[in-house]
Amino acid sequence: SKVVCLNSATAAEELNLRVCGIQEGDEVIVPAYTYTASASAAIHCGAKVIFVDSQKDSTEMDYDKVAEVITEKTKAVVAVDLGGIICDYDKLYAAVESKKHLFRAKEGDSLGARIQQSIGRVIVFADCAHALGASRNGKMAGEIADFSDFSFHAVKNFTTAEGGAST
């Protein structure tokens, strides 16, 4: 029920990252198999992108490798729901929870710090640009991750020629 519309999914992802206080010195995990915008939004925030390979015979990122690359600098992981196939968020959340002890939320009272303190672990973002209307295990794209973004570009499932949304 809470949606912000923007000019693109890239802008929506960058907004989500900035609202959560992602900045220079932070690490953001992104799948190696994705569109450039999944990583460039983090770069625009000044964060270092850590790429994770896909699973064998799948476009989904390898969740064991996600857990392996989480450090004290990791603040976010961006899952990409590609071609209407929603990532296995149960496995992704398990990977993130297994490294919860490494998470260091920002200090202070800024919105980003409060969000990080409230969540208390690496924040899970979903790039749902190719998944509007898709579901997995009874949950729709956009309602599984902590923050999600959608695209309404001309080649997407639902188009307005351009545009994006953040949930």
Residue locations for each model-derived region?
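Structural detector of well-ordered beta-strand residues that form the stable sheet scaffold
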Residues: 4, 29, 50, 123-125, ...
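Phosphate-binding glycine-rich loop
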Residues: 1-27, 41-43, 51, 100, ...
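Structured binding elements
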Residues: 46
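Active-site phosphate-binding strand-loop segment of PLP-dependent enzymes
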Residues: 57-160, 166-167
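Nucleotide-sugar donor-binding loop of glycosyltransferases
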Residues: 26, 32-34, 53, 128, ...
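Short glycine/serine- and small hydrophobic-enriched flexible loop segments
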Residues: 18, 165-166
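Alpha4-beta5-alpha5 switch/output surface of CheY-like receiver
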Residues: 37-38
